[in-house]
């Protein structure tokens, strides 16, 4: 199954994040703090600060929450001092918040993944759900601790025990992968993604839709796949459009040529949606369609434009295709230096045919041009149109049951 981003990692979840996944009455925090924490989660930091200051002297957890409020309000030094004091006093909330500061390099503290993992574990051992989720995420990433799917799953199981959609999704990610001695469990992963998606987690909707479309871990259901993928696309996950395009493109041809042509055209339309949203694989597939005249009128100039956008994002297949177009002048433009630059980059990205193309035409390109192209390739830095990593998604209202 293709990745939703070129690089996909689970996002660390802040203690204040995902307000829609938190109890409306803040019943996940000690009773004396609930009204203050509710105000904080609703964005009323002034009310939260007043209430927490009155509790700070007698509660380390209040110190931790007050520290978070103060950092949000710009009083970074005092906020950090209070969070550190809470952690030193053994507050799980304080340990978790200090861990997040180390994990993200915030509040003037240099990033320290190892220290973050230690603090997350202290809080997780005390039953702090967000700490369990974040510790599991670090084990899944191999960030601050050796990568260990067994440990990741163990902590994420604890975090997901109450049905938190972020934890369900993260556990689904961990169940999707294998690393000896842990084996993948696609059926469990699909169920976890479904449960998270039903609670409005749109990256889960994307992955669940892809599994439905491919019949991985669950019975193949193209109609249901399109439902979830379209929902993800409508709610800020542009890879949903790419996945729908792939789903339509894989649909077996029938004897009805008109229906086949319409199916192909629909697939290209979805690739265009993904391409315009910045998905590099969507840009590459749209370029292929324009170059071949498949589902659209043939237009090499448009093909070169879309290959260029995907190549600039570092997609080796697009870099290879763009290099060939610039060598052959397919779109009316020949530029051996740029062509070789993109072929060098495609080879560096692992494309198996890039070197063979260069070797085939190398004697036709002056040595100075090849050296210039190599220097340009060395200096190249991709420009991404989308985040390279998953970011914490906004939960949407749970979709209606199907």
What are the residue ranges of the model-derived segments?
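N-terminal leader/linker segments that initiate helical-solenoid repeat arrays
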Residues: 12, 19-68, 72-74, 386-402
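Eukaryotic tandem repeat interaction scaffolds
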Residues: 222-317
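Terminal, low-structured helical/coil segments at or just beyond the last alpha-helical repeat
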Residues: 353-402
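Canonical positions in the second alpha-helix
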Residues: 52-55, 85-86, 122-123, 158-159, ...
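Short helix-capping/linker turns of helical repeat alpha-solenoids
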Residues: 27-28, 57-60, 89-91, 105-106, ...
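Hydrophobic face of amphipathic alpha-helices that form TPR/SEL1-like repeat modules
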Residues: 63-72, 97-104, 109, 134-141, ...
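Bacterial N-terminal signal peptides
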Residues: 7-15
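Structural signature of tandem alpha-helical TPR/SEL1-like repeats
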Residues: 43-47, 73-82, 109-119, 146-155, ...
């Amino acid at each position: 199954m293709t990745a939703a981003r070129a690089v996909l990692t689970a996002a660390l979840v802040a203690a204040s994040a995902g307000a829609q996944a938190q109890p409306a009455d803040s019943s996940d925090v000690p009773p004396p703090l609930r009204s203050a924490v509710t105000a904080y989660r609703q964005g009323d930091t002034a009310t939260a600060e007043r209430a927490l200051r009155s509790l700070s002297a007698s509660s380390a957890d209040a110190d931790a929450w007050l520290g978070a409020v103060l950092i949000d309000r710009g009083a970074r030094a005092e906020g950090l001092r209070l969070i550190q004091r809470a952690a030193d006093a053994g507050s799980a909330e304080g340990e978790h918040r200090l861990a997040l500061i180390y994990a993200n390099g915030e509040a003037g503290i240099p990033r320290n993944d190892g220290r973050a993992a230690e603090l997350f574990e202290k809080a997780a051992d005390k039953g702090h759900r967000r700490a369990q989720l974040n510790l599991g995420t670090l084990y899944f990433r191999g960030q601050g601790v050796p990568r260990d799917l067994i440990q990741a799953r163990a902590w994420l199981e604890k975090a997901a025990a109450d049905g938190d959609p972020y934890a369900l999704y993260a556990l689904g990610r961990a169940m999707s992968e294998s690393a000896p001695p842990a084996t993948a469990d696609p059926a469990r992963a699909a169920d976890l993604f479904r449960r998270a998606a039903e609670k409005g987690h749109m990256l889960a909707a994307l992955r669940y839709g892809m599994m439905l479309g491919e019949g991985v871990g669950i019975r193949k259901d193209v109609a249901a796949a399109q439902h979830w993928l379209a929902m993800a696309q409508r709610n800020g996950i542009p890879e949903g459009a790419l996945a729908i395009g792939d789903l339509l493109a894989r649909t077996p041809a029938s004897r009805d040529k008109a229906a086949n042509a319409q199916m192909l055209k629909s697939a290209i339309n979805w690739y265009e949606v993904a391409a315009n949203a910045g998905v590099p694989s969507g840009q590459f597939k749209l370029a292929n369609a324009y170059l071949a005249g498949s589902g659209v009128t043939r237009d090499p100039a448009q093909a070169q434009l879309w290959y260029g956008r995907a190549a600039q994002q570092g997609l080796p297949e697009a870099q290879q295709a763009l290099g060939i177009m610039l060598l052959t002048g397919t779109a009316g433009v020949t530029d051996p230096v740029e062509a070789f630059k993109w072929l060098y980059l495609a080879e560096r990205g692992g494309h198996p045919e890039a070197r063979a193309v260069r070797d085939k035409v190398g004697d036709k390109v002056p040595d100075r041009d090849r050296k210039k192209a190599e220097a340009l390739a060395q200096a190249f830095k991709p420009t991404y149109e989308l985040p390279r990593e998953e970011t914490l998604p906004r939960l949407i209202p749970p979709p209606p049951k199907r």
